[in-house]
Amino acid sequence: MSISSSIKSIQDIMRKDAGVDGDAQRLGQMSWLLFLKVFDAQEEELDLEQDDYKAPIDEKYLWRNWAADAEGITGDKLLEFVNDDLFYHLKNMVVNAEKNPRGLVVKAAFSDAFNYMKNGTLLRQVINKLNEIDFTDSTERHLFGDIYEQILKDLQSAGNAGEFYTPRAITKFIVKVTDPKLGESIMDPACGTGGFLACSFDHVKENYVITSADHETLQKQIHGVEKKQLPHLLCTTNMMLHGIEVPVQIKHGNTLNKPLSSWDDEIDVIVTNPPFGGTEEDGIEKNFPSEMQTRETADLFLQLIIEVLAAPVNGKQGGRAAVVLPDGTLFGEGVKTKIKKMLTEECNLHTIVRLPNGVFNPYTGIKTNILFFTKGKPTKDVWFYEHPYPEGVKNYSKTKPMKFEEFQTELDWWGKESDGFAARVENEQAWKVSIEDVIARNFNLDIKNPHQDEVIAHDPQELLASYQQQQQEIAELRNQLKNILGDALTSSTGSEA
């Protein structure tokens, strides 16, 4: 049976269980099971590679010792073991972070995990289906990477739009352009399920890793933080699938829940698609300077990114970032203007790629951009590149998503930051705006392509708000008119009398 068929069978079995309600819970259930199976596959490899290797958790809780046997415990006995023994132990085990970092990974992964299944017989069927996938087989592991991406898409379809899945084409393009290298610290402060981090890991491995020592270096380069339990667990599993043995740098928490001034500026590369359109809980904004405080998540993340990027030192270039942000960041005023002013003063905002509508369809229609900047030198010019739809395409959809090959024109045009992008030329898709013009526009970066006829396009929410405002104004005018006519009629009646 193929891996995709196994995953589908697992989801079908879970649908029969009364304890699992909806796609999100099905995926949550599958996630902790996947984690333990992938973890055990890694354990087997480490045990073979290292003499005197000691398992980071008690032997009885390793997948091979309670789940691998198709004829093993089932029914109520299995449920009792999972709920009262396995989960209790993994959540509460005492772990020394230095001596047992892999144990810490397990404890963090299970901190908020939950077994939703109420039928032990169905749970055994799910486990047996998972056992059809061999994670020690590199071919199957590679194939599972594609299936894993489908699981993440399913997660987004389950009503968690915008938080978990950035289209692979965008992730790959951003990593290709930022070009993280061996030894550079790579961070995603809102890492979701780890798409940017996995792609960065693969990029460094394929382009810069030669020796086993290089591989050890790469293991320690990847850093991520994720606020929510389920994507954090999926991200940790994702990192293990890609070959990170101890993904302790994938933290479970809110990156913004710490004073901005307490962060060190030491990150070489940041690649991220922070949540946008949402707001943070009360009090989070107090971690930021008073004049820069806001509850809008994307604005806070942009400030954080500027802060944590490494400053240039001893001839080494400052840290660089590529960040997916909505149109609202570009044209927004108030605190947004202050943030953009700070960005252009502290960093070289050298390129903004304007993405077309529908990139995140069908999950959100918000129009987005990719901002590329490097810390240490102020901005002199901002290059804009308007990414067009491919020929014959009018919009993206779930069945017709954006493809990486579409970015070849940008890649051919891109040039080198080291020479100030001297090879770049303006064309139908690309244009340059001086910082003086940006300042004159009060840092409004929503600048239209001067080489094309203006196409008026508005966000649906903006159109709705504008419509409601117009209706309110019409109602007020109607009331004024009624009052004027009423006064006129009263006056006329009085005169006749």
Positions of predicted regions on the chain:
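Conserved S-adenosyl-L-methionine
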Residues: 163-272, 277-279, 295, 299, ...
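Non-catalytic, mostly N-terminal accessory regions of nucleic-acid modification and defense proteins
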Residues: 1-177, 181-182, 247-258, 354-359, ...
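Accessory, often C-terminal, charged low-complexity segments
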Residues: 279-294, 298, 327, 335-337, ...
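C-terminal, active-site-flanking charged/polar segments
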Residues: 348-349, 361-408
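Conserved Class I SAM-dependent methyltransferase catalytic core
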Residues: 22, 26, 229-232, 295-373
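Conserved nucleotide-binding/hydrolysis micro-motifs of P-loop NTPases
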Residues: 229-230, 257, 275-278, 327-330, ...
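Short beta-alpha connecting loops at secondary-structure transitions
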Residues: 220-223, 253, 284-290, 354-356, ...
